[in-house]
């Protein structure tokens, strides 16, 4: 009886060994496949190219590879990098802004034109970083490791690839006017032009009654925001980069909408400028 039990135990041991050995190649193969999967994916929509990396790399490497894939001669100030893993954050911001505008439109129906304007644009989660290749090469602090800023993405515990979109475009030739106007306008860039020069190009009566007629905001292509006073008693010089957005803000908003102008500005900083 003892001999039979010993034989059975030995058989089970050998069976487990064979099973473990048969699983080992599969585990190694799976591990190898995971190692080969891209940990970082950067899409260049303008060039129709996707750059894949098996590990995170620095911005300089991506810009060098982009140049090698047809992105030579892009305009650095209007270049945009978007963090696709963080997209829900911008989607939530857009939903919040549209809801605020819908509520405002119950009191001020003219606000509906702003809803139409904002909904016509594409927004992605902007990864704000200097995309001037010369600056990235010469200044180490401008050459970060590309890592998603999404709070929901636990990189150490997730196999999810980090995904970015990099828009590298030629120098824009226009400036976009949005906000408290009847509709969006793309105006030809005026060298050394000031806000009055652009507003004079709009059709007569284009500004809404609820528009702020003393100040506006300029969202530069790199995401920097400048407030510009343009009333005759407090006007000041301003710079409009090629591809800038001029936001005509609302004036004298009810207290419950006190943050609306700033929320719209923040949303427009994430607009895909194509």
Describe the residue ranges of each PLM region.
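Bacterial N-terminal signal peptides
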Residues: 7-15
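Bacterial N-terminal signal peptides that target proteins for export
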Residues: 1-6
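Ser/Thr/Pro/Gly-biased, low-complexity, turn-/loop-rich segments
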Residues: 20-274
């Amino acid at each position: 009886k003892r001999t039979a039990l010993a034989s059975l135990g030995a058989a089970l041991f050998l069976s487990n060994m064979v099973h473990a050995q048969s699983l080992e190649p599969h585990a190694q193969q799976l591990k190898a496949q995971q190692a080969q999967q891209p940990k970082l994916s950067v899409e260049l929509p303008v060039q129709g190219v996707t750059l894949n990396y098996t590990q995170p790399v620095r911005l300089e490497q991506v810009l060098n590879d982009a140049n090698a894939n047809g992105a030579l001669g892009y305009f650095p100030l209007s270049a945009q990098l978007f963090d696709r893993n963080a997209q829900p954050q911008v989607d939530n911001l857009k939903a919040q802004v549209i809801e605020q505008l819908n509520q405002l439109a119950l009191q001020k129906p003219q606000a509906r034109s702003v809803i139409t304007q904002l909904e016509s644009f594409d927004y992605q989660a902007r990864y704000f970083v200097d995309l001037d290749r010369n600056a990235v090469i010469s200044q180490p602090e401008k050459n970060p490791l590309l890592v998603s800023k999404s709070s929901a993405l636990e990189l150490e515990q997730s196999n999810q690839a980090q995904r970015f979109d990099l828009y590298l475009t030629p120098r824009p030739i226009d400036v976009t006017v949005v906000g408290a106007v009847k509709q969006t306008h793309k105006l030809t860039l005026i060298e050394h032009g000031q806000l009055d020069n652009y507003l004079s190009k709009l059709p007569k009566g284009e500004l809404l009654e609820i528009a702020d007629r003393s100040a506006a905001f300029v969202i530069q292509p790199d995401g920097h925001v400048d407030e510009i006073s343009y009333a005759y008693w407090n006007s000041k010089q301003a710079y409009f980069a090629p591809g800038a957005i001029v936001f005509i803000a609302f004036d004298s908003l009810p207290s419950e909408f006190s943050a609306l102008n700033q929320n719209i500005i923040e949303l427009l900083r994430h607009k895909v400028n194509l």
